[in-house]
C-alpha cells in the first residue's frame, strides 16, 4: 500500500507540472517537492526541498502505511523544512484530528529520521 500511495502522489505531481508548463529545474513548483539525491563525494544521500537540504537519516521505520499526500501536505512539508533549515523549529497548530502529528511523522519518515511524540495533556 505504501508504494501505491507514493506512486499516486508522484503521478499527481507530474500531471500538475505538465499542466502548469514547468520546464526548468529552478521553477518553484519543482523546487517545492521533496527530492532525494545521491552525493558521490560523500557517498551519502541528501534530501532537498526548496533551498533546504538535509542528510538522509537511515532510520528504518518499516514499510507501514503512509499518509495520503495532498497539496496542503506539500505546503506543510515546504513550511516545516524551511523552518528547520533556518534552525527555527516547527510546531504545527490547529484543531484536534486534522493530521498535524501524522503529517510530521510522515515527513520524518520520508527523511529517514526518528520522530518521538509526547502527549502532555494526558
Walk through the language-model features, giving the residues of each.
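Walker A/P-loop
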Residues: 82-120
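Outer-pore/vestibule module of multi-pass helical membrane proteins
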Residues: 66-70, 79, 95-99
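Extended, charged/polar low-complexity intrinsically disordered regions
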Residues: 1-71, 75
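Hydrophobic/aromatic-rich, well-ordered segments within soluble, folded domains that form packed cores
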Residues: 75-81
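Short, contiguous acidic/charged loop-to-helix segments that flank catalytic cores in large enzymes
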Residues: 67, 120-121
Amino acid at each position: 500500500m505504501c508504494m501505491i500511495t507514493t506512486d499516486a502522489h508522484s503521478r499527481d505531481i507530474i500531471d500538475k507540472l505538465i499542466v502548469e508548463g514547468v520546464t526548468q529545474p529552478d521553477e518553484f513548483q519543482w523546487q517545492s517537492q521533496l527530492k532525494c539525491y545521491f552525493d558521490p563525494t560523500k557517498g551519502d544521500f541528501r534530501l532537498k526541498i526548496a533551498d533546504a537540504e538535509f542528510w538522509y537519516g537511515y532510520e528504518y521505520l518499516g514499510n507501514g502505511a503512509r499518509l495520503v499526500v495532498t497539496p496542503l501536505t506539500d505546503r506543510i512539508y515546504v513550511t516545516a523544512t524551511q523552518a528547520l533549515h533556518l534552525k527555527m523549529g516547527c510546531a504545527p497548530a490547529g484543531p484536534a484530528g486534522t493530521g498535524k502529528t501524522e503529517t510530521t511523522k510522515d515527513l520524518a519518515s520520508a527523511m529517514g529520521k526518528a520522530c518521538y511524540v509526547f502527549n502532555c495533556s494526558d
